[in-house]
Amino acid sequence: QASKFVNWVNAKDDVYYHPFTEPQGFNKVDPAPYWQSVVEPTCSFSEAVSFQQYLCEQGLAPKTIANKEYEVIANYGYHLDAAKFITLLRKHCISELGVEHISDTVERIEQASCGDITCLQTKEHGAQLADLFVDCSGMRSLLLGETLKVPFVPCDDVFLADTAIATQVPYINENDPIACHTISTAQEAGWIWDIGLQERRGVGYVYSSKHCSEEQARKTLANYVGLEEVKTAKKINFKPGHRKIFWKNNCVAVGLAAGFLEPLEASALMLIEASANYIADQLPPNKELMPITAKRFNAIML
């Protein structure tokens, strides 16, 4: 129900909450000047204007057991096990939406003389033809980047983090408290995310490899979770940046195929959802109108 930022301004005892519920009357009155002139030295902005910080500090839920499904007292998001969520979505799409799911390897991509992608030649299922191709191939950007040659625009001059080490931390006891907010703790060369799930915590260190070695990063992560060493951590290398455009010809990239800045999961999911909704809502009735849709999509998403 919030994001808690620890030690981002000062290296000790500095905490700021970004609550998901806006202060009462926030769209009508700006409370910032009053906070600055009256209470800034004694408490943070979120503490002064929102009750949600108190819910988080007390480990309370944003709703009660008496609330109906999706009925809330305070706004909240979901902490999900990504692997289980993918399985759920796949089953739902196949059984309820009639989607044909093909798991295969793309061996060759064929194009028309105008540059449009005509089909994907797969290893086990042969040619897969379509009018529109959505590139969800991850950072490789197989269709938009490798095939249609849309250049990558690096952002490493302002986003210094380029490496992440992620691990899973089980709860010691089944009754251990589960944080009802995401915790983001600043470190010397980056920041650590800490997300409480039902059966475990997802913890990872995002850092700049120019300012921290992998060995140092692992030690920092181990110290954070209270272990001598982290043995099962997964290392992820990434280059912050994005494709120059996200839609070219009859191919549109969504998610990592379009770009990646930092493992800011909520922001990334929002962009994926916004992209999918736009494609579904604005899908042109014929290929002749696709350039107009692509131009609008690129203007909005970039």
Features from the language model and the residues they span:
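Extended charged low-complexity segments that act as oligomerization/scaffolding linkers
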Residues: 2-9, 175, 224, 282
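Active-site-proximal substrate-binding core of FAD-dependent oxidoreductases
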Residues: 278-302
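Predominantly flavin-linked oxidoreductase catalytic cores and closely associated redox partners
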Residues: 67-222, 276
